Amino acid sequence: MTHPKAPGFSRGITETMIRGLVDAFYAKVRADAVLGPIFEAKIHDWEGHLAKLTDFWSSIVLMSGRYKGRPMPVHAAIPEISNEHFVRWLKLFGDTAEEVCPPQAAFLFKDRAMRIAESLKAGIAIHRRAAATAS
């Protein structure tokens, strides 16, 4: 259910738009030389992953509350992730958002993606420092 005060509501974002963005973006990710190998090694149920990420973005922009996961531990457990991967992820995501969404919707998706990436990078850095200290 979409919350009327959700940031995506006034920008015309729909569940169909979110699923289209997720599908188009992850098709690019899977074909990407930088990101593809990491995702292919970790994701074994792509349909389930796409559904989970659709729920994630629905919760972010429509406040649907459908996503119940914890992305930080999942990403922190992948030692290969580096700043280069976040830069590439943001580039592909931004390009895809601009291709499949109207401008106001694309802006919101890109803004939230940047905030999420910064949060994940900070959390991963803390996790890695703690792991190095414990060793």
Predicted features along the sequence, with ranges:
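Core of compact, soluble alpha-helical bundle domains
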Residues: 1-135
